[in-house]
UniProtKB/Swiss-Prot annotation:
GO CC annotation: cytosol
GO terms of molecular function: ATP binding; galactokinase activity; magnesium ion binding
Catalytic class of the enzyme: transferase
Site (Transition state stabilizer) residue list: R27
Record keywords, A-Z: ATP-binding, Carbohydrate metabolism, Cytoplasm, Galactose metabolism, Kinase, Magnesium, Metal-binding, Nucleotide-binding, Transferase
Oxidoreductase keyword on record: no
UniProt binding sites for Mg(2+): S130, E162
Pathway field: Carbohydrate metabolism; galactose metabolism
EC nos: 2.7.1.6
Name under which the protein is recorded: Galactokinase
Organism: Clostridium perfringens (strain 13 / Type A)
Catalytic activity: alpha-D-galactose + ATP = alpha-D-galactose 1-phosphate + ADP + H(+)
Length: 387
């Protein structure tokens, strides 16, 4: 259905059939939260929700773009000769940013495109709708102009667009998880070295349920910066006593030796989270390789508790979802995912219990919070593809 709407919208706006259809996923992080900047591992995977596109190559230097998610904006038009950021160009700044970065890197792009997109990722929910769009655009341009961009380079290009063009200080995880995504696999990634490893994620009779608090992450940025500073300060203190360059180089056992050097109790708890979370990621990967989904679920639960009690980034909404999820039959594990303070939580739920799970957790959330959460059943999909 979505593809038919996409095609008909393309024909209505541009008077012809599109050359090609494309899809780019969103992502979740299964475990390994708030440790990418502490030298730790993240463990994301692409999901079957994402951004769809219909696109055609033009024979001039004009780009025309229309989004079914922002219909009131109509068709936004610009030329390859002016790729400067303009606030009024809204979401198409991502298209302009990717074009600008690619052209500056010497890729030959000499014609414009017509583009219609439609995403089914909720905006502002922490499922990486912007990285999904960036990787979609790279895929389209790579296909149309035969640019031969590697998957790792595609991720780095997306990060550069975010950092230098859009002006968001994001890391590499989102673009990497999407660009290198493979069906039924998660990616163990060290964001500093870009070392990565695919880990098969066979969920058997279970699905991933994404639970959206429907609370925008308005606190996330200020608290995120605060947490980073607390970790950086702690690292500076520990460096006086041990030769490390990041918190996650320490094991919990090693940290026991030095923890009395951190006098501030808040900073101490931040360290405890970072170091224990990195160990949980390694344990989670081992559990999956041994097909031990039960242990994997328990580690997810422990991760949420650590983020709630030691890192203090969950908040009432995410806690309500996770804590009610734990009580339901057929649940292997549940935790917040992303930056916290709103956004989404995830649960791994037996397929026979999914409907009951959504009904029970949804009702408990509405009773406690006063408005509804949204639920999405997702599986682990491929990276950006031409359909």
């Amino acid at each position: 259905m979505e593809l038919n709407t996409l095609k008909s919208t393309f024909i209505n706006n541009f008077g012809k059939e599109p050359n090609s259809l494309f899809f780019s996923p969103g992502r979740i992080n299964l475990i390994g939260e708030h440790i990418d900047y502490n030298g730790g591992f993240v463990f994301p995977c692409p999901i079957t929700l994402g951004t769809f596109a219909a696109a055609s190559l033009r024979d001039d230097r004009i780009c025309r773009a229309y989004s079914l998610n922002f219909e009131s904006l109509g068709v936004i038009e610009f030329s390859l000769d002016d790729l400067s950021y303009k606030k009024e160009d809204n979401w198409t700044n991502y298209l302009k940013g990717v074009l600008k970065v690619l052209i500056e890197k010497g890729y030959k792009i000499d014609k414009g495109i017509d583009l219609v997109i439609n995403g089914n990722l909720p905006n502002g929910a922490g499922l990486s709708s912007s990285a999904s769009l960036e990787m979609l655009i790279v895929k389209i341009l790579d296909t149309f102009f035969s640019l031969n961009i590697s998957k790792v380079d595609a991720a780095l290009i997306g990060k550069e667009v975010e950092n230098t063009y859009i002006g968001v200080n994001s890391g590499i995880m989102d673009q990497f998880a999407i660009s290198l995504g493979e069906k039924d696999k998660a990616i163990l990634l060290d964001c500093n070295s870009l070392y990565y490893e695919y880990v098969p994620l066979n969920l058997g009779d279970n699905s991933i349920i994404i639970m959206n608090t429907n609370k925008r992450r308005e606190l996330a940025d200020s608290k995120y910066n605060e947490r980073r500073k607390e970790c950086d300060d702690s690292l500076d203190t520990l460096k006086k006593y041990t030769n490390i360059s990041s918190l996650c180089e320490l094991t919990s056992l090693e940290f026991e030796t030095y923890k009395d050097k951190i006098e501030d109790s808040n900073k101490l708890r931040r360290c405890v989270h970072a170091i224990s979370e990195n160990e949980r990621v390694k344990d989670a990967v081992k559990a999956l390789k041994e097909n031990n989904l039960e242990l994997f679920g328990q580690l997810m639960n422990q991760s949420h508790i650590s983020l709630r009690d030691d890192y203090e980034v969950t908040g009432k909404e995410l806690d309500t979802l996770a804590e009610n999820a734990w009580k339901q039959p057929g649940v292997l594990g549940a935790r917040m995912t992303g930056a916290g303070f709103g956004g989404c939580a995830i649960a791994i739920v037996n397929n026979a219990h999914v409907d009951e799970f959504i009904k029970n957790v949804g009702q408990a959330y509405k009773d406690a919070i006063g408005y509804e959460a949204s639920f999405y059943v997702a599986s682990i999909g491929n990276g950006p593809t031409e359909l």
